[in-house]
Amino acid sequence: MEAVRFAVAVVLVFCYVTSSNAQMTSPPSGGAGGDAHSLPCIQKLMPCQPYLHLATPPPATCCMPLNEIVAKDATCLCAVFNNVDMLKSLNLTKENALDLPKACGAKADVSLCKTSAGTNSSSTPPATPKTPPASSTSTGTGSGSTGNAAPSTAKPTSSAPAINFGGLSFASAVVATLFF
C-alpha cells in the first residue's frame, strides 16, 4: 500500500510540474499581440517544429495539418505570420516562415494577412458574427462595440489553457484526497 501511495504522489508531482511549466510558457505567446485564439491551431503544427530550420522535407505528420490550416484557417495563418514575437521565439523571420509551407506544397497566401494589417485586425473576422448582438445592445456606439468585441473574444480563449490546467490541479487534488 505504501508503494501505491508513493507512486500516486510521484504522478501528482509530475502533473503539477508539467502544468506549472505549461502555464509559465503560455502567457508570453498569448500576451505578445493578443493571439491566444490561435493557440489551438499552433498546437496542430507542433510536429513541424523540428523541420523549421532543416533542409529535410517535412513528413506527412507535419504537412497534413499545415496544408489544412493554410487551406481552411487564414486567421490562424495570419495570427502566426503577423506575430513578430512568436516568429522571433522560433528564430524565424516573415520571409523564412514561408519556407515550411512551400516544402509541404502549400500555397500560403499572406497577402490576406497584409490586407488585415496586423494581429488585432486578423482577430476581427471571428468577432464579426458576434458583433451584431453587441451592437444591438448598445445601438448608439456601434463602432465602440466592435472594438470591445475583439478583446472579449480573445480573453475567454486566452484563459482556456488556465482552465484546463486548473482542472488538472483540481483532478490531482481529488486523487490525492482519495488515496491519502
Swiss-Prot record:
Listed GO biological process terms: proteolysis
Keyword Zinc: no
Glycan-modified residues: N91, N120
Membrane topology of the entry: Lipid-anchor; GPI-anchor
Annotated segments matching region Disordered: 116-156
InterPro entries xrefs: Bifun_inhib/LTP/seed_sf, Bifunc_inhib/LTP/seed_store, LTSS
SUPFAM superfamilies in UniProt: Bifunctional inhibitor/lipid-transfer protein/seed storage 2S albumin
One Gene Ontology term, aspect cellular component: plasma membrane
Primary location class: membrane
Entry keyword set: Cell membrane, Disulfide bond, Glycoprotein, GPI-anchor, Hydrolase, Lipoprotein, Membrane, Protease, Signal
Removed propeptide positions: 159-180
Low complexity composition-biased segments: 116-125, 133-156
Gene null: resulting phenotype: Inability to limit tetrazolium salt uptake in seeds, development of hair-like structures on seeds, altered pollen morphologies, deformed or collapsed, and decreased levels of omega-hydroxy fatty acids in seed coats.
Disulfide bonds: C41-C78, C48-C62, C63-C104, C76-C113
Molecular function GO labels: peptidase activity
Described function: Lipid transfer protein involved in seed and ovule maturation and development, probably by regulating the fatty acids homeostasis during suberin and sporopollenin biosynthesis or deposition.
Record-stated family: Belongs to the plant LTP family.
Protein name in the entry: Non-specific lipid transfer protein GPI-anchored 3
Provenance organism: Arabidopsis thaliana
Native organism taxonomy: Eukaryota, Viridiplantae, Streptophyta, Embryophyta, Tracheophyta
This protein's encoding gene: LTPG3
